[in-house]
Amino acid sequence: FVYGNGVTSILVQAQFLVNGQRRFFYTPDK
């Protein structure tokens, strides 16, 4: 998606990736 200018878009997408990785790695196995 596009959010603000190119740099802002990259930062937002990177933040979503980091949040997704945290959720993936720190979700306990059930």
From Swiss-Prot:
GO terms for biological process: defense response to bacterium; killing of cells of another organism. Bacteriocin with antibacterial activity against C.jejuni. Antimicrobial activity is lost upon treatment with beta-chymotrypsin, proteinase K and papain, but not when treated with lysozyme or lipase. It is found in: Secreted. The keyword Secreted applies. Its main location: secreted. It comes from Paenibacillus polymyxa. Belongs to the bacteriocin class IIA/YGNGV family. This is Bacteriocin SRCAM 37. Thermostable, activity is retained after incubation at 100 degrees Celsius for 15 minutes. Stable from pH 3.0-9.0, inactivated at pH 10.0. Keywords: Antibiotic, Antimicrobial, Bacteriocin, Secreted. It comes from the Bacteria. GO terms for cellular component: extracellular region.
